[in-house]
Design a protein with these regions (language model features):
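Short amphipathic alpha-helix that is part of the acyltransferase structural core
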Residues: 1-54, 62, 176-224
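A conserved beta-strand-loop-helix scaffold within acyl/acetyltransferase catalytic domains
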Residues: 30-57, 63, 71-79, 206-266, ...
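Conserved catalytic-core motifs of GNAT/GCN5-like acyltransferases
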Residues: 78, 122-124, 139-143, 148-161
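A short, internal acetyl-CoA/4′-phosphopantetheine-binding micro-motif in the GNAT/acyltransferase core
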Residues: 87-95, 125, 271-280
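Conserved acetyl-CoA-binding loop-helix of GNAT-fold acetyltransferases
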Residues: 96-109, 274, 280-295
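Conserved GNAT acetyl-CoA-binding A-motif
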Residues: 111-131, 295-308
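C-terminal "cap" of GNAT-fold acetyltransferases
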Residues: 148, 152-189
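Conserved small/polar residues in nucleotide/adenosyl-binding loops
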Residues: 312-314
Length: 314
């Protein structure tokens, strides 16, 4: 068996369809009913975007005329430029033939050629298999090839709508704690008058949130990068819901963001963070409740919120 690995043209519908088909099949096999799969259109938009933030590359894996897998490589261009993000998708019927191993070697060579010194990837497994995912294909594949688990997350699902009386009780409970802060919410782009303050806080998320043993560095605040991510959301047909808490001096004290996929009808919890100096004022729950209120009002069709919580907190 000889595996041919070729980079796809993101504007070639047939190649994108084949790439996405392998990705979706692998995700559904590994996660079952809990699989959260980006739509074909969402993936296509991301691959086609001309990004100043990340160099995205996607590959097809072929055995003769048969497509047996797909892979992708993400190379950050502004922050953490020592890192390469790797992803490999081999549908179950093609596993245990060395296809993933060849794909991994190819991605690692590409990463080294691009002067990257750290490779990162992710794997999913059923919760009942424990914090190490023993026996699950993804974690076992990674361990066999010298990768170690740096950070574990648990996917959770909140059915919608949330009982309004529960939100009322929470708001009443936290009212005095947040009385000195201004809470602002919006749908779509971050308003121009707060985007710089949002960006300053958002840049600390990767290092303020649990990072385990991940080799990552603090990001530099960059409004252009935020605006690029918003442009991608528009291309994907996704809708962003944002809430910010402003301190008495006008700085960003906390924020939260939900993104709704118009493809699957679900909402996804993106960043939520409270600035260290403002912790203890119930701001985390305040911005989340405000976002849920807005989500109920503006997107009543949303079926659930998916979120990811570090194992460190469980």
């Amino acid at each position: 068996m000889t595996i041919e690995i070729s980079r796809i043209d993101p504007f070639d519908d047939d190649e994108v369809d084949a790439w996405w088909g392998c990705y979706a099949a692998a995700e559904r096999a590994d996660r079952g009913a809990d699989a959260v799969v980006w739509s074909r259109a969402e993936c296509r938009s991301e691959l086609q975007q001309q990004s100043a933030v990340v160099d995205r590359r996607a590959y097809l894996l072929r055995d003769g005329a048969d497509i047996v897998g797909s892979a992708s490589l993400g190379l950050p261009l502004k922050d953490n430029t020592h890192v390469a993000h790797l992803a490999i998708s081999v549908p179950p019927r093609h596993r245990r033939r060395g296809i993933g191993t060849e794909a991994l070697a190819h991605l690692e060579r590409e990463a080294v050629t691009s002067d990257r010194t750290t490779a990162q990837g992710s794997a999913s497994w059923p919760y009942e298999l424990g914090s190490e995912g023993a026996g699950s294909p993804g974690p076992e594949f990674a361990r066999r090839h010298g990768y170690t688990l740096a950070l574990g997350d648990v996917q959770s699902r909140l059915p919608l709508p949330v009982d309004p009386s529960l939100l009322d009780r929470i708001e009443n409970d936290i009212a005095s704690a947040i009385s000195q802060y201004e809470i602002r919410s919006w749908v779509g782009r971050i308003p121009d008058d707060v985007v710089e303050r949002w960006t300053i806080l958002d840049a600390t998320l990767e290092t303020e949130a649990p990072t385990g043993e991940l080799d990552i560095e603090p990001q530099k605040p960059d409004v252009d990068s935020i605006r690029e991510s918003e442009e991608l959301l528009d291309l994907q047909g996704r809708v962003s819901f944002g809430t910010i808490a402003l301190s008495p001096d006008g700085d960003a004290a906390a924020y939260s963001q939900l993104v709704v996929s118009t493809d699957d009808g679900n909402a996804y919890q993106w960043g939520t963070l409270v600035r260290a100096a403002d912790r203890g004022h119930r701001l985390g729950i305040a911005v989340k409740v405000a976002n849920l209120r807005m989500l109920h009002r503006e997107a009543p069709q949303a079926r659930a919120v998916y979120t990811y919580l570090s194992l460190i907190h469980i």
